[in-house]
A protein has these predicted regions:
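N-terminal secretory signal peptides that target proteins for export/translocation
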Residues: 1-9
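Bacterial N-terminal signal peptides
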Residues: 8-22
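Boundary at the C-terminal end of the N-terminal hydrophobic targeting segment
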Residues: 25-27
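Signal peptide-proximal N-terminal region
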Residues: 30-32, 56-82
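Extracytoplasmic "Venus flytrap"
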Residues: 32, 38-59, 86-91, 114
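Second-shell loop/turn segments in exported
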Residues: 43-50, 83-87, 106-108, 155-163
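Short, well-structured alpha-helical segments in soluble
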Residues: 84, 88-107, 127
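Extracytoplasmic ligand/sensor domains, especially the bilobed periplasmic-binding protein
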Residues: 107-167
Length: 167
């Protein structure tokens, strides 16, 4: 139960963070492109139930934000779109999923059920953002708790919601 509560709390924080990227703006009459969110988690294999639980909670949060008109940006209100990618719990699959997500226009990558996958995604996102600054991606880590992710491997494009394992 505690694990579910912590997961729920982290996912709620992800939704709030997405809202915090907003700036007060009026909605223009034309439809703006949505903010693309990519969830990269193990949706198959031994931890599929954990990935599916994360997906259910994020779908609920996205629907709630969109029901209120989306997130306010400088250009106006934008809806959120959540796309799921199955990493199968493997780092190589996570990297393949990241490339697919970026190619599909993802602006935010969400992952958290594996510190190993988080580490490879952090590195790949930093390299991508250096190579293609016009297509930057932000990594939202809601549960990977390896202390190295915010210590020796820390980078600007990684935001972690949870305390690390040493805390």
């Amino acid at each position: 139960m505690l694990v579910f509560f912590r997961l729920w709390s982290r996912l709620w924080q992800v939704g709030i963070l997405c809202l915090s990227f907003s700036v007060n703006a009026q909605t223009p009459s034309l439809q703006l492109p949505p903010v693309q969110l990519a969830l990269i988690e193990g949706m198959s294999g031994p931890f599929a139930n954990t990935g599916e639980a994360v997906l259910r909670n994020l779908v609920w949060a996205v629907e709630r934000v969109n029901a209120r008109g989306g997130v306010a940006t400088q250009e106006g209100k934008r809806k959120l779109v959540l796309n799921r990618y199955d990493s199968k719990g493997q780092s190589e699959e996570a990297l393949t999923s990241l490339r697919s997500a970026i190619d599909s226009g993802a602006q935010f990558v969400l992952q958290g059920n594996s510190s190993a996958n988080a580490a490879v995604l952090m590195d790949a996102i930093q390299k991508h953002n250096e190579r293609e600054p016009q297509k930057r991606v932000l990594f939202l880590n809601y549960a990977a708790v390896d202390p190295a992710l915010t210590q020796e491997k820390c980078n600007f494009w990684h935001f972690r919601f949870d305390a690390h394992a040493d805390m």
